[in-house]
Amino acid sequence: MILQLLFYSLFTHLAVSQIDVNQALNQNKLNIDTISSSAISDAELEKTFPRTNLSRMRNALKSLRQNWSAKLQAMPARNYQNAGTNQENGATEQQKPLREKPRDRVKMEGDTLHQVNKAAGLNDILYQGDMVLTDDQIATILEARDETTVSTASRARRQAYRDRYYPSTTWGSSVYYYYDRTATPKIVKAFEQAVAFWQNVTCINIMQSSTAINRIRVFKGQGCYSYVGRISGVQDLSLGTGCEEFGTAAHELGHALGFFHTQSRYDRDNYISINYANIDPSYVEQFDKETSNTNFNYGMPYDYGSIMQYGATSASSNDKATMIARDTEYQDTMGSDFVGFYDISMMNEHYKCKELCPAASSAQCKNGGFPSPRNCAICICPSGYGGILCDQRPPGCGDSVTATTTWQTLTNTIGDGLPTLRDNHTMCNYWVKAPDNQAVEIRISGLTTVTIDGCIFGGVEIKTHKDQKLTGYRYCSSADQNTVHRSTGSLVPIILFNRYASTKAVLEYRAVTPSVDVSATYTTFAPIVNSCQDLHPNCDFYKFFGMCRSKKIRSNCKFTCHDCNNNNASPFGSNFFNNNYNSFNNWYTNKNKNYYPYSNSNNNKPWMWFF
């Protein structure tokens, strides 16, 4: 029965992944009337969203979708696989084809916020997938789309929400929240982690109070959503089933503190292109963007690794990319569950925290860090940097190595190898240093982990940009093998991270002469696997249950399934060292039922856990 369920999941997924992208949109024509309304009754919705005029919200979203439908119908049919489309003029834009990377599925309720909310049936009342709006926000964000009808001063300004009432729409120095009786221990744990994070890196005090006039009610609703900014009185923040994780909680709390989505920035077309053929019509408004008059980003660049950036396949009708990074090496970085350094910096600007640390008497931070508003003598550092002044490698797992002109190898495997989600990532920080006036070249020789938007379950981050405040390139697919990056400086931080099964990376590095063009240079090659390697993190699991008879599994688990045609075998990617199946069997006997990879004990449906 176990094998039947797993093979059913595997081949169903493979079949769905081959849907024709042009057929999905019927040559760009969206029928707005076919969009289903919420699966929840209006009476229940009115209780769930007491601060929102549901009829007005639905009409505003429908109007926005109709506007988008008109735009799309005006565009000629085209092949969207290897090209993006400019939102403003509909012109085809040739881009480097994306490497094929079939996505894994880990959680039955959905691995991403969009998947969870789609299953909850909230598509017709949430803006951009997870935001609840007040009447005033509906008016300024959705209804006032015409520049000639509403003055710039009266309109919403975002990524950080700044309307005509700013800064009174922020929380000031104190934010209050309380837990509804529906909040489970998992919700409390995830939200407390998000509270601790945002509080530690800003001047905002986030405290529990069930009596404060303005407060957030944290509860278990259907899906994940929040209001944007402080709306006065009690406002809801839902962390339903599938949302009880740090990344989602930090994202929703980011909304409550005043953040909108990164992909709605007015300048987003310079950084991502939209693949309209793959968009689920119910979520077409998710890709709405602002103008330069309505968008306020505090002068900060677009960060693909922002906690407020949706994943590349978000709102997809066919599991294919709806957003394509113009720097395609950033494709898997989008959808992160880490809070980006620019998120932290922008939140500090939005709440005027940086004004608390006078430049003359505060820490002189290195590598783009800034003084902590909690203690101006120490710095808040970009990822990959630590120490009081951001001039040291973060403590713990990792190492500092010196690059020479000869290729050297860095190899590590982190994670326990078991298909259970952990609350926190295991992290290893490496510094690769070249001699002064030389650059570092990094090549991914091997990578085994779970492949998913944002690499939220594990992967490797490589920081070669001149601006070290930006999130680095993140990878979590064996298809990324033989990717090469050349740094703009003599130091490259590398971060290996994991919180599900295991992640193994084999990286090669050497010192080279800097390129003439020092702006984010890199070279990529098609993946070539010459040695006998496992290309999936769960090969031992498949062998344990006799699944090596499958040609598909043998091709991805050559070492474990003994399907090698040469003697250059290496146990790349093995999760259970020394083939210790007795330990794996002990885990199987005492498994965590919350993340049972074989079948769901409640409805006997298979976990979608495959290549």
Curated annotation (Swiss-Prot):
* Required cofactor(s): Zn(2+)
Annotated Gene Ontology cellular component terms: extracellular region
Residues annotated as the enzyme's active site? 252
Positions annotated as pro-peptide in this chain are 18-158
One GO biological process term: molting cycle, collagen and cuticulin-based cuticle
For this UniProt record, give its keywords in alphabetical order, as a comma-separated list: Cleavage on pair of basic residues, Disulfide bond, EGF-like domain, Glycoprotein, Hydrolase, Metal-binding, Metalloprotease, Protease, Secreted, Signal, Zinc, Zymogen
User: Where's the CUB domain?
Assistant: 397-516
For this entry, the protein name equals Zinc metalloproteinase nas-31
Q: Which organism is it from?
A: Caenorhabditis elegans
What gene name is listed for this protein? nas-31
